[in-house]
Structure formats: structure tokens, C-alpha cells
């Protein structure tokens, strides 16, 4: 590989790892298939200060999407919601959408109204894609969201990123030490292990998110989980995987 930087210097390497997030101009240059299809989803992220337990992660649904609430660095609360353009486009801006749609959920309204924004304005992410991606593209080993993104509703994206980095780094070390004979074998083994580790979780995540996007069905599913709480750890187990083993 030869990589040219903005300062016109050139770097050469036997290995390149792609860990540049869910969507980038690099994807366009690599002509990855998922980038050719428009996604109907957009995300909004806000950090606020207020009262929220350190050991709690909350998920609240609203018409057209869902919102996650969790404590992050600097004692801030992270509010991040995903919705579709169909639900969003009828409102003139984010504030109007939140007032008219999100705040129909009383719990979300209480969190937003009883906190103070820490960003000058909310961060928006358009074209969020949950489509299948290839773990290896043009001989580049892809990690994290670059290799595949799970719905925040039902998976730990940061955990997936760390796990895929572990898979990739261990195999790359074996390759550089001559334990894996060829580049083709390295790419094949990484693809095999990545799919074995994540494919089922991604499929379950897509299915759960699809069901919760159905406005008429989501309240019934939540009622079902309240009546049968033993189902929740089973769902978590299917979407979050196993603890990592450190060698």
C-alpha cells in the first residue's frame, strides 16, 4: 500500500486497517456497495448536563424512531436518537421535531426539559446505513462501524469495534510473524472470524429494530417485555455477544 497525506508525503505499509467510522468519502473512493444506496435514517446527538444515574442506559421509543440516554465523560448525559426522513421532513427544524414528536414520550420530555445543553447546537448525522458491508475491501482490513454497524437499540457498537480490532490485530500479528502463509489466507480468515462473531448479532439487531420501527407494534412489544421480563436478558445475549478473552 502507498498512502499519500495532505502534506504530499507518502507512506508505505504491508497492512492498512480501515477504522474511519460508519460513512466516509473513503467509502466513495473504494466504491463500496452500501454507499451507492441512500439510507432513510438520520441521527441526532446532544450532550446535556442534568440528573441521570451513572449505571443506567435508557432506551425510549417515539413515533418514527427511538432515543438512547446514557452518562458519558465530564458528567454529561448523552442523548442520541435515530429517526427516518419521513418522520422528520414535515418539521422545519430539530427543535420543532423534538417538541412535536419526541416529547409525546413523557419520559423523554422530562429528560430534555430538565437538562441544559452542552453543545452549541445538536450534531446531526445523515445517511446512517445498517446495510451489510464487507469486512475486507480492496485488501483493507475493516474494523468497527467501517466493517458493519449494529442498531444502537440492540447492540454495543463500541464493544463491537474493540472486538473487531482484537480479531484483526491478532491475525495481522500472525501474518507478519509468518504463521499465516499468505495475504489471501489472512483476508479469508479475518472475514470468516468476523462473520462468525458478528453476523448473527447484526441479523437479530436488524430484526428487532425493524419491529420497533412499526408504530402500531412497538407499544405491544414493550408490554410483552414488561409481562415477560426474562426475555430481556435473552435478547441482550443474542445481540451483545460474549465477554472478550484477552490473550
Residue ranges of model-derived segments:
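Short secondary-structure transition/capping segments
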Residues: 34-38, 86-96, 158-160, 222-238
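C-terminal helical "tail/cap" subdomain of flavin- and related membrane-associated enzymes
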Residues: 170-247
Amino acid at each position: 500500500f502507498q498512502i499519500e497525506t495532505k502534506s504530499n508525503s507518502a507512506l508505505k505499509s504491508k497492512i492498512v486497517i480501515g477504522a474511519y467510522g460508519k460513512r466516509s468519502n473513503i467509502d466513495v473512493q473504494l466504491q463500496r456497495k452500501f454507499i451507492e444506496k441512500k439510507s432513510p435514517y438520520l441521527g441526532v446527538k446532544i450532550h446535556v448536563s442534568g440528573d441521570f444515574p451513572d449505571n443506567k442506559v435508557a432506551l425510549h421509543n417515539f413515533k418514527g424512531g427511538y432515543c438512547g440516554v446514557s452518562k458519558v465523560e465530564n458528567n454529561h448525559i448523552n442523548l442520541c436518537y435515530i429517526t427516518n426522513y419521513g418522520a422528520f421532513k414535515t418539521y422545519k427544524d430539530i427543535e420543532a421535531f423534538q417538541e412535536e414528536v419526541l416529547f409525546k414520550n413523557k419520559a423523554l420530555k422530562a429528560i430534555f426539559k430538565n437538562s441544559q445543553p452542552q453543545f452549541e447546537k445538536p450534531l446531526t448525522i445523515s445517511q446512517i446505513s445498517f446495510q451489510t458491508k464487507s469486512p475486507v475491501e480492496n485488501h483493507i482490513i475493516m474494523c468497527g462501524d467501517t466493517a458493519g454497524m449494529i442498531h444502537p437499540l440492540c447492540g454495543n457498537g463500541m464493544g463491537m469495534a474493540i472486538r473487531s480490532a482484537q480479531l484483526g490485530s491478532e491475525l495481522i500479528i500472525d501474518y507478519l510473524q509468518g504463521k499465516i502463509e499468505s495475504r489471501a489466507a489472512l483476508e479469508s480468515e479475518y472475514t470468516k472470524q468476523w462473520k462468525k462473531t458478528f453476523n448473527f448479532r447484526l441479523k437479530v439487531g436488524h430484526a428487532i429494530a425493524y419491529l420497533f420501527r412499526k408504530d402500531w407494534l412497538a407499544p405491544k412489544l414493550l408490554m410483552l417485555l414488561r409481562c415477560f421480563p426474562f426475555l430481556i436478558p435473552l435478547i441482550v445475549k443474542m445481540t451483545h455477544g460474549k465477554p472478550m478473552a484477552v490473550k
